[in-house]
Amino acid sequence: MAGGKGKAGKDSGKSKSKVVSRSARAGLQFPVGRIHRFLKQRTTSSGRVGATAAVYSAAILEYLTAEVLELAGNASKDLKVKRITPRHLHLAIRGDEELDTLIKATIAGGGVIPHIHRYLMNKKGAPVPGKPGAPGQGPQ
């Protein structure tokens, strides 16, 4: 029986099915197999990880990535540029309260978030310290 065929060289009726990745089965873009391998490497000595754990982890990572990229895209659109930079990622993460608590890492090239404390701001009508007419600046 050459070539895996049945009687008289005819096909047995079964067509070879294409290999479908676990990412495609789950409807994800992130690689489920690779994440499963990484999870097995990082666990205890037995290296046993459930099959659905990798799918779930890939789905979580994909969701978080999509969320950050959407916010960074909005930040770049607000600044009227077409390319997302580390600065846009930084603004997106620090601008979202939940992502800010989740991601505490320093982003290289992200800069800082502009913030001036309320106490340092001038009140309307109040003289600015150091200028003539400010309290404590008169002749003594």
Curated annotation (Swiss-Prot):
<feature type="cross-link" description="Glycyl lysine isopeptide (Lys-Gly) (interchain with G-Cter in ubiquitin)">
    <location>
        <position position="124"/>
    </location>
</feature>
<dbReference type="Pfam" id="PF16211">
    <property type="entry name" value="Histone_H2A_C"/>
</dbReference>
<keyword id="KW-0007">Acetylation</keyword>
<dbReference type="Pfam" id="PF00125">
    <property type="entry name" value="Histone"/>
</dbReference>
<dbReference type="GO" id="GO:0046982">
    <property type="term" value="F:protein heterodimerization activity"/>
</dbReference>
<dbReference type="InterPro" id="IPR007125">
    <property type="entry name" value="Histone_H2A/H2B/H3"/>
</dbReference>
<comment type="subunit">
    <text>The nucleosome is a histone octamer containing two molecules each of H2A, H2B, H3 and H4 assembled in one H3-H4 heterotetramer and two H2A-H2B heterodimers. The octamer wraps approximately 147 bp of DNA. H2A or its variant H2AV forms a heterodimer with H2B.</text>
</comment>
<dbReference type="InterPro" id="IPR032454">
    <property type="entry name" value="Histone_H2A_C"/>
</dbReference>
<protein>
    <recommendedName>
        <fullName>Histone H2A.V</fullName>
    </recommendedName>
</protein>
<keyword id="KW-0544">Nucleosome core</keyword>
<keyword id="KW-0238">DNA-binding</keyword>
<dbReference type="InterPro" id="IPR002119">
    <property type="entry name" value="Histone_H2A"/>
</dbReference>
<dbReference type="GO" id="GO:0005634">
    <property type="term" value="C:nucleus"/>
</dbReference>
<dbReference type="GO" id="GO:0030527">
    <property type="term" value="F:structural constituent of chromatin"/>
</dbReference>
<comment type="function">
    <text>Variant histone H2A which replaces conventional H2A in a subset of nucleosomes. Nucleosomes wrap and compact DNA into chromatin, limiting DNA accessibility to the cellular machineries which require DNA as a template. Histones thereby play a central role in transcription regulation, DNA repair, DNA replication and chromosomal stability. DNA accessibility is regulated via a complex set of post-translational modifications of histones, also called histone code, and nucleosome remodeling.</text>
</comment>
<dbReference type="InterPro" id="IPR009072">
    <property type="entry name" value="Histone-fold"/>
</dbReference>
<dbReference type="GO" id="GO:0045892">
    <property type="term" value="P:negative regulation of DNA-templated transcription"/>
</dbReference>
<dbReference type="GO" id="GO:0000786">
    <property type="term" value="C:nucleosome"/>
</dbReference>
<dbReference type="GO" id="GO:0003677">
    <property type="term" value="F:DNA binding"/>
</dbReference>
<keyword id="KW-1017">Isopeptide bond</keyword>
<comment type="similarity">
    <text>Belongs to the histone H2A family.</text>
</comment>
<keyword id="KW-0539">Nucleus</keyword>
<dbReference type="InterPro" id="IPR032458">
    <property type="entry name" value="Histone_H2A_CS"/>
</dbReference>
<dbReference type="GO" id="GO:0000785">
    <property type="term" value="C:chromatin"/>
</dbReference>
<keyword id="KW-0832">Ubl conjugation</keyword>
<keyword id="KW-0158">Chromosome</keyword>
<dbReference type="GO" id="GO:0000793">
    <property type="term" value="C:condensed chromosome"/>
</dbReference>
<feature type="region of interest" description="Disordered">
    <location>
        <begin position="1"/>
        <end position="23"/>
    </location>
</feature>
<dbReference type="GO" id="GO:0031507">
    <property type="term" value="P:heterochromatin formation"/>
</dbReference>
<dbReference type="GO" id="GO:0009996">
    <property type="term" value="P:negative regulation of cell fate specification"/>
</dbReference>
